[in-house]
């Protein structure tokens, strides 16, 4: 067979494979991270627990250290239109932030974890990270391509792509294996941002990638170092405008607003030690 014919045949074969929705091999960057099936199981389990939610269906995404999307899942018992479609890309955005702005045990001063929830106050005008939310934008040329019937399956068109994005409300967490070694991030979206955080936490715990016992954080709870912080209070002496148009202040600098049916983050599982 001539080289040109071989290339043509290979291209046709690849096209047929993609069109049929067959599961392609996991990207090399995803080695050591959970499969789509494992993510799906963890998501279904997490959604069934008490998360202070509105009862909406969810999306979840795992992203590798280099930003490669490794797995995307949605509620396994429903149709595509049974959850917010926009939350698919938001879950990727959260996972990408969770890997891009978390540090593993190889960091100069060791591991340090910030959930997306920890960034809400810090990125407001006057906050220490103001402007971060505008960096590393989602790539629209990648985010919305492909067969929508495959969204949330093992053949989701986003798998293997680098989508980018930074999100600054609850639902994104770093993934850490034993010893505080960071493997990537997980992002969850589909309900209130407070519920998204709760479900992401339970997903990470089920996947056994919550080895943060020696990892630094800002929550003030060493057993949950990157937990959501509800410390925004009303003040007339400066601070940020909240949705009610009143001025609020986060003493920690990393607080997150409360949500409808607000959950109790202190009930979340403790992280594991190395």
Where are the regions a protein language model picked out?
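N-terminal signal peptide c-region/cleavage motif recognized by signal peptidases
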Residues: 20-22, 26
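Flexible, solvent-exposed loop/hinge segments and secondary-structure transition points
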Residues: 26-274
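Bacterial N-terminal signal peptides
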Residues: 9-19
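Bacterial N-terminal signal peptides that target proteins for export
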Residues: 1-10
